[in-house]
Amino acid sequence: MAEAATRSVGKVTQVIGAVVDVAFEGELPAILNALETDNNGNRLVLEVAQHLGENEVRTIAMDSSEGLVRGQQVIDTGAPISVPVGDETLGRIMNVIGEPVDEAGPLNTAHKRAIHQDAPAYVEQSTEAQILVTGIKVVDLLAPYARGGKIGLFGGAGVGKTVLIMELINNVAKAHGGYSVFAGVGERTREGNDLYHEMIESGVNKHGGGEGSKAALVYGQMNEPPGARARVALTGLTVAEHFRDQGQDVLFFVDNIFRFTQAGSEVSALLGRIPSAVGYQPTLATDMGQMQERITTTTTGSITSVQAIYVPADDLTDPAPATSFAHLDATTVLSRSIAEKGIYPAVDPLDSTSRMLDPMVVGEEHYEVARKVQSTLQRYKALQDIIAILGMDELSEEDKLAVARARKIERFLSQPFFVAEVFTGSPGKLVALEDTIKGFKGLVNGEYDNLPEAAFYMVGSIDEAIEKAKKLAAA
């Protein structure tokens, strides 16, 4: 506040929930500039959204506007919201305006970066199609992730979204030495707290941050005003962009991308915009596009984004999820019916898709094996009604063989996770892509027809399955 003399000073003229109008006598602050005011001893940041004329601007509050009064002094910072970036953010939790909220001391970084950035220019972008190997068999084989791509993660409550996210953070750190950024957008505070502690327990982060931490956390929870929820994804993305520009392969998680849209629609009406379909903001596609276009691979590094997507009332044609789909390169669908069988990760091998599963990208062998695996599983699915009514004995020999192979494939798609070691007691496995292809190729070609089903459950490579079969035979 001491610098007020050199900056434009305005006064609050109107407060309507998350939207605050401010009048300036001199020069008006630019759109997206951050304004600061003191709200009962707390720093409140307002972001300029509109110029109303009559020397007035309309702003969105990044925190609760309760306690603000008309005539209160507001200072223009002269720049957009800027947040700390760099290695010091790893293992820490910060809010939308870059303040630490984990009670682990101040966040001192050498650099700060504005949360509104342009997407990288075409000349800076890498157009080479590359796979990001995750070490998770079902993902790498059937719905591979593109390096610098966007992946949609669909799944209900309790099917293992969080565990899958944590395993990806762990594997990317191990296999690629990369960092991860997790943006909690409008999720439950309890879940955010659980994730923070689980990351410390599973070794992904160290308590209080510092050396050995692999993930930075940025939270704007359900109880925050819509301004914070609409901007927290951009704060997380800004932290990720800094790591990318240092040559890192970064994993960027957004949970949940729907809440980003929802927060935008909440402030849209208050800003006086006419709503579009289903009451969403008219700028829905623009808001989404501006954020998604920043997530990309450049010639220096990459940001690969995994976005949990909530589908309102399971309606995939709702404008919010439908707008997200246009940006996705791959989808990972978690299925409750697979989780009920005890197969984890509970990824649906027939519902999950990827545009990287193309012989020109993954190679002929990988493509053929993946398609054979899917057709075997599809056949098993088609025969399940017959099996339920008449039993296995009524099937032809050919169908019996297909069912036996499909059941082995189903079990071989499971694998023990590093982050779940604490609960399961079995050590985690990171499986190389060559081993994954080799194992499934042998399975679909009938090389392992003599091994029992149980040998394929919760193992890494096919060699481990063969070893397990020997132990089972000896027992």
Curated annotation (Swiss-Prot):
<comment type="subunit">
    <text>F-type ATPases have 2 components, CF(1) - the catalytic core - and CF(0) - the membrane proton channel. CF(1) has five subunits: alpha(3), beta(3), gamma(1), delta(1), epsilon(1). CF(0) has three main subunits: a(1), b(2) and c(9-12). The alpha and beta chains form an alternating ring which encloses part of the gamma chain. CF(1) is attached to CF(0) by a central stalk formed by the gamma and epsilon chains, while a peripheral stalk is formed by the delta and b chains.</text>
</comment>
<dbReference type="InterPro" id="IPR005722">
    <property type="entry name" value="ATP_synth_F1_bsu"/>
</dbReference>
<dbReference type="InterPro" id="IPR003593">
    <property type="entry name" value="AAA+_ATPase"/>
</dbReference>
<keyword id="KW-0406">Ion transport</keyword>
<keyword id="KW-0067">ATP-binding</keyword>
<protein>
    <recommendedName>
        <fullName>ATP synthase subunit beta</fullName>
        <ecNumber>7.1.2.2</ecNumber>
    </recommendedName>
</protein>
<keyword id="KW-0066">ATP synthesis</keyword>
<dbReference type="InterPro" id="IPR027417">
    <property type="entry name" value="P-loop_NTPase"/>
</dbReference>
<keyword id="KW-1003">Cell membrane</keyword>
<keyword id="KW-1278">Translocase</keyword>
<dbReference type="InterPro" id="IPR004100">
    <property type="entry name" value="ATPase_F1/V1/A1_a/bsu_N"/>
</dbReference>
<dbReference type="InterPro" id="IPR020003">
    <property type="entry name" value="ATPase_a/bsu_AS"/>
</dbReference>
<keyword id="KW-0472">Membrane</keyword>
<keyword id="KW-0139">CF(1)</keyword>
<dbReference type="GO" id="GO:0045259">
    <property type="term" value="C:proton-transporting ATP synthase complex"/>
</dbReference>
<dbReference type="Pfam" id="PF22919">
    <property type="entry name" value="ATP-synt_VA_C"/>
</dbReference>
<dbReference type="InterPro" id="IPR050053">
    <property type="entry name" value="ATPase_alpha/beta_chains"/>
</dbReference>
<dbReference type="InterPro" id="IPR024034">
    <property type="entry name" value="ATPase_F1/V1_b/a_C"/>
</dbReference>
<dbReference type="GO" id="GO:0016887">
    <property type="term" value="F:ATP hydrolysis activity"/>
</dbReference>
<dbReference type="Pfam" id="PF00006">
    <property type="entry name" value="ATP-synt_ab"/>
</dbReference>
<keyword id="KW-0997">Cell inner membrane</keyword>
<dbReference type="GO" id="GO:0005524">
    <property type="term" value="F:ATP binding"/>
</dbReference>
<dbReference type="GO" id="GO:0046933">
    <property type="term" value="F:proton-transporting ATP synthase activity, rotational mechanism"/>
</dbReference>
<dbReference type="GO" id="GO:0005886">
    <property type="term" value="C:plasma membrane"/>
</dbReference>
<dbReference type="Pfam" id="PF02874">
    <property type="entry name" value="ATP-synt_ab_N"/>
</dbReference>
<comment type="similarity">
    <text>Belongs to the ATPase alpha/beta chains family.</text>
</comment>
<dbReference type="InterPro" id="IPR000194">
    <property type="entry name" value="ATPase_F1/V1/A1_a/bsu_nucl-bd"/>
</dbReference>
<comment type="function">
    <text>Produces ATP from ADP in the presence of a proton gradient across the membrane. The catalytic sites are hosted primarily by the beta subunits.</text>
</comment>
<keyword id="KW-0547">Nucleotide-binding</keyword>
<dbReference type="InterPro" id="IPR036121">
    <property type="entry name" value="ATPase_F1/V1/A1_a/bsu_N_sf"/>
</dbReference>
<dbReference type="InterPro" id="IPR055190">
    <property type="entry name" value="ATP-synt_VA_C"/>
</dbReference>
<keyword id="KW-0375">Hydrogen ion transport</keyword>
<feature type="binding site">
    <location>
        <begin position="155"/>
        <end position="162"/>
    </location>
    <ligand>
        <name>ATP</name>
    </ligand>
</feature>
<keyword id="KW-0813">Transport</keyword>
